[in-house]
């Protein structure tokens, strides 16, 4: 590869590292072209899977401020640059690796923090951001409904209690007090 081509490749990889919120490094030794196409499809729209040169990618990662991946650049390496939900991409990689043991997850980076292969697999076990947000919204809605019911119940309970006390006093007032004595003649 000519020097200007290398500089352009490093610049492109640097932009990909900077624009993605996660990058997962994998070893793809033994995968066919058809399997790589299938992997790219399984990652979806929010991830780009690229076979890369280790030296150029290492330089690009360092230029992007990511120096925690240096040990992972050995052997045939490909990077999944994730711009959307990292959980979905991690699930796609994990599931593909289960079906295709030649794909090995080496590690990665999420929002500037280095992740081991095990941490990426744990990330894949999480529910997606949308599911977690909907559960959170449901929990808030349930608490709001409970609070509304409590606030509605308090005035009606007060009215019923006051009505019961009034009825009790009327009963006691009518039966419990002596009748006025008739005037003695």
UniProtKB/Swiss-Prot annotation:
An example Gene Ontology molecular-function term: large ribosomal subunit rRNA binding
Gene3D superfamilies associated with the record: 3.30.70.1730, 6.10.250.290
Keywords noted in UniProt: Ribonucleoprotein, Ribosomal protein, RNA-binding, rRNA-binding
Signal peptide bounds: none
InterPro entries to which the protein is assigned, alphabetical: Ribosomal_uL10, Ribosomal_uL10-like_sf, Ribosomal_uL10_bac, Ribosomal_uL10_bac_type, Ribosomal_uL10_CS_bac
GO BP term, pick one: translation
PROSITE patterns per the UniProt record, alphabetical: RIBOSOMAL_L10
Region (Disordered): 165-185
Disulfide bonds, paired cysteine numbers: none
A single GO cellular-component term on record: large ribosomal subunit
RNA-binding among keywords: yes
Coiled coil: none
Pfam family, one: Ribosomal_L10
Function: Forms part of the ribosomal stalk, playing a central role in the interaction of the ribosome with GTP-bound translation factors.
PANTHER family in alphabetical order: 39S RIBOSOMAL PROTEIN L10, MITOCHONDRIAL
Protein family: Belongs to the universal ribosomal protein uL10 family.
Oligomeric and partner information: Part of the ribosomal stalk of the 50S ribosomal subunit. The N-terminus interacts with L11 and the large rRNA to form the base of the stalk. The C-terminus forms an elongated spine to which L12 dimers bind in a sequential fashion forming a multimeric L10(L12)X complex.
Name under which the protein is recorded: Large ribosomal subunit protein uL10
Source organism of the structure: Streptomyces griseus subsp. griseus (strain JCM 4626 / CBS 651.72 / NBRC 13350 / KCC S-0626 / ISP 5235)
């Amino acid at each position: 590869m000519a020097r200007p081509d290398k500089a352009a490749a490093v610049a492109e990889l640097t932009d990909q590292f900077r624009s993605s919120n996660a990058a997962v490094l994998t070893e793809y030794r033994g995968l066919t072209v058809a399997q790589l196409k299938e992997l790219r499809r399984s990652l979806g729209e929010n991830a780009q899977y690229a076979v890369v040169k280790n030296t150029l990618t290492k330089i690009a990662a360092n230029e992007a401020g990511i120096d925690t991946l240096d040990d992972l650049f050995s052997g045939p390496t490909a990077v999944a640059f994730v711009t959307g939900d990292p959980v979905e991409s991690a699930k796609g990689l994990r599931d593909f690796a289960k079906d295709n043991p030649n794909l090995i997850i080496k590690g990665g980076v999420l929002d500037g923090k280095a992740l081991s292969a095990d941490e990426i697999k744990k990330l894949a076990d999480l529910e997606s951001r949308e599911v977690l947000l909907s559960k959170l919204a449901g929990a808030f809605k349930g608490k709001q409904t409970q609070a509304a019911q409590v606030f509605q119940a308090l005035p009606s309970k007060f009215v019923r209690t006051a009505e019961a006390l009034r009825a009790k006093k009327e009963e006691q007032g009518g039966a419990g007090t002596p009748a006025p004595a008739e005037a003695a003649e």
